[in-house]
Each structure stands twice: as C-alpha cells, then as structure tokens.
From Swiss-Prot:
It is a multi-pass membrane protein. One of its GO terms (biological process) is cytochrome complex assembly. Belongs to the CcmF/CycK/Ccl1/NrfE/CcsA family. The gene is ccsA. It holds the Pfam family Cytochrom_C_asm. This is Cytochrome c biogenesis protein CcsA. May interact with Ccs1. GO terms for cellular component: chloroplast thylakoid membrane. The chain crosses the membrane at residues 17-37, 44-64, 71-91, 98-118, 143-163, 225-245, 258-273, 286-306.
Length: 322
C-alpha cells in the first residue's frame, strides 16, 4: 500500500512539473529576455527526471523485477528517456533545440501512460515465463532508449524540412514578384526598384544567414541524436536475438515486432548513409528520418495493437510489450 501510494504521488508530481516546464518554454519563446525562466525550465526537467526515476525504482522494489514488462512501464521508461536526453546537454553546457521537443514528448508519453486506458496495467502481475530472464533489462531498456533518441532526432529533421520548405517557397515568391514588377515599369523606375531590391537583399541575406545557421544546427543535432539512437537500437536488437534463442530456440522468427524493428533499423541505416554522403543534400537525409518517425511509432505501439506474434502477451488489452 505504501509503495502504491508513493508511486501515485511521484507520477502526479512528475506530470505536473513537466507541464509547468512546457508553460515556461512557451513563455521564453515569446520573451527571450527572461533568462531566469529558461534556467527554471531546465531545473524543472531535472526534478521531473528524479521523480520518474523514483517512480521506476519504487515499482522495481514493489514488483520485484525491472519495470519494463508491459506497455505502461515501457511508456514511463520512455518518458524517463526523454528527460535524460533533455538534461544531458544542459549539464554539458551545450545549446541545442532538443528542449523544445523532449518536454512535450515526455508529457505526451507519461500522460498516455497514466490515462484511464492503461489503468489495469498499473497493478502488479506475475511475469510470464518468457519475460523471466536477465535479458529483460538489457534488451527492453536499449530498445526504449533507442526509440526515444530516434524520435527526438526525427522530429528535429521534420523541423528542418519545414523551415527549408518555407524558405524555398518564400524565395520563389519573391523572385516571381521581382520579375513581374521589373517588366511592368519603364527603365528609370526599374533602376529605382533595383536599388530598393539591393537594400532588401542585404537585409534578407542577414536573415537568410541566421536561418542557414539554424538549419545547420538542426541537422547537426539530428545526426548526433539519431546516431546515438541507432546504436541503442542495434544493441537492443542483438540482445533480443540472443534472448530469443534462449527462450524460443531461434535467433530470429520474423514476427511483426521483429519485422518492424528490422524495418526501423534499415530506415535509419539509410539515413546515416545519406547523411554522410557529401553528394546528397541535407533535405534528402531529413526526409528519410521523417519517414523513420512514423515507422518507430508503428514498431513501438502500432504492432502491439494487433495482439499477434511472439512479442504479444495479451491482445487489445494493452498488456503487450516490446
């Protein structure tokens, strides 16, 4: 009873704190001068990290096994992973744009985990024989950490594509506007218009420079985070293969979860290849990463809804896991 009450308290505290953090982020987006608020949001995510850590440890002690045996626990661990990705650059004093993604991602996953849909899974249950293994912690934790990093990196790539697309549309519209005006006036008016265009161009060049710098930063952090997530995903798949051989007598069975995990791994392997290829534009790799965002959710959550395969321990009751 004590552990259950403590878990309930930590769950609501972490959810409330991360909600406040998102509010602070929205305020700092509107008012850049308030430096103290930005620092408060970072400290809020640190508090969220410790609350979720306490929640996981409490559930670990209460249940007697590592809390990654069902969808509820894996979502809490996913929220914990988002908070880690958020605070690590903060301690390293690196400025990045992950904070705009990790805080909403954390509140989304934790909000869904604590919703009424998964209420039955909050109670303790005896592990099925297939999950009673020392590989549970290694395999599932690596997979969830990989999902978290890949989701963050993919969202950065989506943001990169949106900014690049808007920039291309704006440049195209300005060029068409300039051409139309150029051929509709006489020569003197054209020269005056040309001088104005040069002045506007100097202003736009500065703005385009900062936009290009921002796009470069998005690409840089997307590549770093996806590379880390790809490493975690690879370790998770390999450890899962070893576990599968011990449990089922085969390293690979091509059930839905394994198939989509392989598809996810392939998509991000293609991303890393296109990203390191200097002959290809940045947008090409960003498109691949954006596709990977949808693939991850299919692999992590969508396949569980099918209720089939070796990785399904319960059908549409949300009692399945990775």
């Amino acid at each position: 009873m004590i552990f259950s009450t403590l878990e309930h308290i930590l769950t609501h505290i972490s959810f409330s704190v991360v909600s406040i953090v998102i509010t602070i982020h929205l305020i700092t987006l509107l008012v850049d001068e308030i430096v103290g608020l930005s620092d408060s949001s970072e400290k809020g995510m640190i508090a969220t990290f410790f609350c979720i850590t306490g929640l996981l440890v409490t559930r670990w002690i209460y249940l007697g096994h590592f809390p990654l045996s069902d969808l509820y626990e894996s979502l809490i661990f996913l929220s914990w992973s988002f908070s880690i990705i958020h605070i690590v650059p903060y301690f390293k004093k690196h400025k990045n744009h992950l904070s705009a993604l990790t805080a909403p991602s954390a509140i989304f996953t934790q909000g869904f985990a604590t919703s009424g849909l998964l209420t039955e899974m909050h109670q303790s249950e005896i592990l099925v024989p297939a999950l009673q293994s020392q590989w549970l912690m290694m395999h599932v934790s690596m997979m969830v950490l990989g999902y978290a990093a890949l989701l963050c990196g993919s969202l950065l790539s989506v943001a990169l594509l949106v900014i690049t697309f808007r920039q291309d549309i704006r440049i195209l519209c300005k060029n068409n506007h300039f051409l139309n005006k150029s051929f509709s006036f006489d020569e003197i008016q054209y020269m005056n218009k040309g001088n104005n265009v040069l002045q506007n161009t100097s202003f736009l060049s500065v703005r385009n420079y900062y936009r290009a710098q921002f796009i470069q930063q998005l690409d840089h952090w997307s590549y770093r985070v996806i590379s880390l997530g790809f490493l975690f995903l690879t370790i998770g798949i390999l450890s899962g293969a070893v576990w599968a051989n011990e449990a089922w007598g085969s390293y690979w069975n091509w059930d839905p979860k394994e198939t989509w995990a392989f598809i996810t791994w392939t998509i991000f392997a293609i991303y890393l290849h296109t990203r390191t290829n200097k002959n290809l534009q940045v947008a090409n790799s960003a498109i691949v990463a954006s596709m990977g965002f949808l693939i991850i959710w299919i692999c992590y959550f969508g396949v569980n809804l099918l209720g089939i395969g070796l990785h399904s321990y319960g059908s549409f009751t949300f009692s399945s896991n990775l």
